């Protein structure tokens, strides 16, 4: 019998449901001597945790910025980096919402807009880039609620704490309480 091994997986919060509900159980079924312990947060916060000593065997970042920083700082060997997954941003509303917002074109109608904090949350960085590209980011500053990770943004919209939010498509699909 093989010795049991525990791997630490550090992954963007947007990937938690996918890993916990599907990938980890399947991996552990195929590899009964290996247990996977998931640590989920924004990629920026995970980068900091790794720099401060988190021993992650695998790191799934939502953006190249954090991965590149860890490679530059020699926490990760560049030959071990693989671009494996991709996602896209979507605008969501709660299923029970009364907002008139139907898409990015009329996002200014929202009273509150939840996005990830662009300083540490890749989805927030991408949301800022998209809204800047549309010429809207600065004009909407007073409406933003900045989440610590994409799951927090999703939960704010699902609970009607925010009119709309910008999250990854996979997160929107994982919640029955929001619509794209």
Label the predicted regions:
Residues 57-61:
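Periplasmic-binding protein-like
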Residues 7, 34-36, 89:
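Conserved beta-strand core positions
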Residues 73-81:
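A short, gly/pro- and small-residue-rich
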Residues 80-89:
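Short, glycine-/small- and polar/acidic-enriched structural segments
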Residues 45, 54-55, 78:
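Short glycine-enriched, charge-decorated loop/helix-capping segments at active-site entrances
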Residues 2-30, 44, 51-52, 63-64, ...:
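Exported/periplasmic ABC-transporter solute-binding proteins
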Residues 32-34, 56:
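Short, well-ordered coil loops that connect the C-terminus of an alpha-helix to the N-terminus
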């Amino acid at each position: 019998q093989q010795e049991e091994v525990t791997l630490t997986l550090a992954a963007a919060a947007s990937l938690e449901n996918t890993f916990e509900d599907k990938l980890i159980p399947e991996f552990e079924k195929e590899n009964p001597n290996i247990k996977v312990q998931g640590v989920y947060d924004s990629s920026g916060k995970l980068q900091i945790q790794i720099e401060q000593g988190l021993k992650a065997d695998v790191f799934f970042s939502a953006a190249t910025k954090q991965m590149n920083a860890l490679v530059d700082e020699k926490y990760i060997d560049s030959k071990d980096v693989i671009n494996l997954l991709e996602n896209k941003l979507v605008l969501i509303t709660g299923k029970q919402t009364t907002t008139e917002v139907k898409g990015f074109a009329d996002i200014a109608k929202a009273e509150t807009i939840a996005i990830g904090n662009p300083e540490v949350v890749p989805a927030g960085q991408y949301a800022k880039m998209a809204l800047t590209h549309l010429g809207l980011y600065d004009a909407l500053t007073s409406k933003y609620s900045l989440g610590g990770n994409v799951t927090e943004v999703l939960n704010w919209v699902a609970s009607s704490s925010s009119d709309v939010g910008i999250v990854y498509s996979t997160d929107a699909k994982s919640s029955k309480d929001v619509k794209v």
